């Protein structure tokens, strides 16, 4: 393993199957595109659906147990309904009885009572006929008739005179011991030759006793044929998987309108497809009902591959006979057979849905064929190569990639139907290939290798080096047992999630923190425009955000290596740009106006401060440097210096202790520098309004990994270690960060003697021909287990607050009022003024975020949302999702003003409501909308012109007057949400202007937010409506009728609550208002109110005014006065 990378990757294990011994013969496993589910088959062939976020098993289904229950039902039914064997045995018993007791009717009667056949005087061969109609022949006496449907007909007793001289009845034998469910199609019965009476009598009891056993044996033989065998493939097949496979260009507006179509009921088409050695089963994971796929060609040999289509009911099976069979899941029959593939087992199928449905197949014969599914014909066939191991289709480029047995990757273009390129895999033997887009890796192919267990990234152009993740070092650092990677599955919508079948366990490994595209934005005062800078194709590019969909990518003179991953950061003033190379540690600071290099060097990490009072002066630049302190045990000398790129130990007795030095300086004419010596484990920082320092905790246990910069890192107290059982979460900012893995790579390869010159010179890094490997990282994904992140003040370098769990990213508001701290599965929103305190917590894992006027726009795995942080949570706005569902539903309707002044999101790939596939980065909010960037560095713009969204943003900015003007354009059905939004922010009076909510609901909103004065202004409006006979809507409780008396009681409640809040004038107003609605109780409360405030004059006036009309309350007041 090469240790040239100094990067501490942000990969972490978010799921691991615990205590399970999973069969690895075929590795059946799949991951759901929408729900956090995986499905796999355990060692007992049970189908397990498990939630990989909380480890909860949602389904544990046993097909074999289902078959056993079916067998028991058949046997139970068999006991109730006699079989033909039982009839034959009873018939032979009658023969013996008749011969030995001729003329005796009692024996015949007893046998008839037991359901046996009696002798007819006119027929020597009595046979029970069991036909499709279930009728009973007149020649049989007391026979239970069985229809084809399994129904039982009441026995019919026929009285007949037995003839003692009649010949013996031949014995009945059923072919193959046929039973109710295992009968020949024509229901034929074979008659044996006439046997002797004595033999029949001797064998009568044996036939009766063995009857049930023979039937059971036959049933077991047939059920053995139905045994599942080992499970080869398992897939989710429901409406979500079909929707995610639909990646055709959505250029029609009708595509958006079709989203509102009624979806099928839950569970109707939600299947798990199980392909085993002996059977193909569709399991409805809601009802747990099974449906068998009966294909005669697969009775002896099961299919080798399965593929699905998004908008057709076909499932394609690649068989061992070079045939492809299309199974129609609606008709439940074979729709077509695609013949013409040369001899050889078809190992892989891929569905291609462009303009029509096409299917690509590849086999051991070395041919790659393209089929037209609609016509069933062979569209094209590429030249023969070596045996095809795996296939992949890239819907972005329209290319087909074929992995061959001779360690090559064949790339075909379906537009030109020609071979594009041929990439060599070197000496590595891979078993799988997938198209891959990940901003962290410049490569665009994902390959899996069994042993050593590695996931490798290749480039189709061959211009970049191979980049590999060593899963054996990542998940098994003890090196006691080498791991084997049997299968790797890429998440359909989240390419940073890799589902790995490693040894006998299932892992989900994520590189989420570094998967989103790297970019920075700044405001150009000269052009009055925001500009975004990003690495692309070996150079630093810039684009204007004003016309982001039409502007050209401007190439700057700054050249970047294709083999590097960079972290970009910009100064608060927007004048300076820092570029930090993750692997080599080189950094440079550029002046954007001239692209002049102001400073360069080496550092573990760099960061900029947030905006100060004067952004041109109060901006600071910070960097981390690793220093070493070497101690010679003989000379007792200490030396201190910057750690060079290559450290070679010349004396065995030397001990090297590594330390971290934090340097910050004001980036102006003064260049005042501050230094802070940190612990050896602190090797990463984050910028913003406050300086964040990451610290990796050390544990002393077996299998520890020493973190250093190569050379002889001793066991001194300064060396950082992390064990295989460490609970620390290694996090990273966008684009990755920090370097702590050189010694990791060094130690992980000591046993293999591959550690010479592990810490290669960073200047020679790009020229190295060896592949770059991921360092071994052991993580758990649980941030609560470790508080290893500390915020510091930029100017004093003193800690601010307590230590926090290490976040993935901190998003600071430009107005310095809010910040969002993102963790793996949740994020916090903090308010910075007047004190640093938490506002809210959301259980969502965000991948990117941007602030705009106190509104947070963020992206998750499946959608793009915006929230309006407040101590009282409000409903988020869903701007786009992978399924196309948004909120509000009319977000992009013309009537709501959404598309009236804005351009479409993308004319080629998606409409505004559909989130681009894969990780995205939110860049900026401007006049055109929300600008975002995908992993291919393609720009998108989501319009933000819906009036409800504008209202929320204006209200969040405290621009209430503008928000109320905008509210008049919003559909009244959203007025309730708007009123709630206003009242929790202290503006209940503005709710009175909204016509979409009733006065009673306005009153409830004011009461819930303790706006008592405003609520009393609404009471007269409601009472007037009641007096005039108008209907009063009670949205909270439709069963409760709103009357004058109930309004009076509500006014009394308002007065009491106002008293508790010391709002005495409001309380007095409420009690006085209640005297006209509920006078008895209101006068008492008003009198008590005056007594409490010692207003005796007002109390006397009240007594005099009610002395005649309400004498009881007047007497009570007299007691108060006395």
Swiss-Prot record:
Keywords assigned: Repeat, WD repeat
Family matches, as PANTHER family: TRANSDUCIN_WD40 REPEAT-LIKE SUPERFAMILY PROTEIN (PTHR45521:SF2), TSET COMPLEX MEMBER TSTF (PTHR45521)
Region (Disordered): 88-131, 178-215, 731-775
Quaternary structure and partners: Component of the TSET complex, a heterohexamer composed of tstA, tstB, tstC, tstD, tstE and tstF, which may act in plasma membrane turnover. tstA, tstB, tstC and tstD are likely to be the core complex members with tstE and tstF acting as associated scaffold proteins.
Name of the protein this chain belongs to: TSET complex member tstF
Short name of any one Pfam family annotated for the protein: WD40
Stretches forming WD repeats: 298-337, 342-381, 383-422
Biased composition (Polar residues): 178-190
InterPro entries: TSET_complex_member (IPR053290), WD40/YVTN_repeat-like_dom_sf (IPR015943), WD40_repeat_dom_sf (IPR036322), WD40_rpt (IPR001680)
Biased composition (Low complexity): 88-126, 191-215
Signal peptide: none
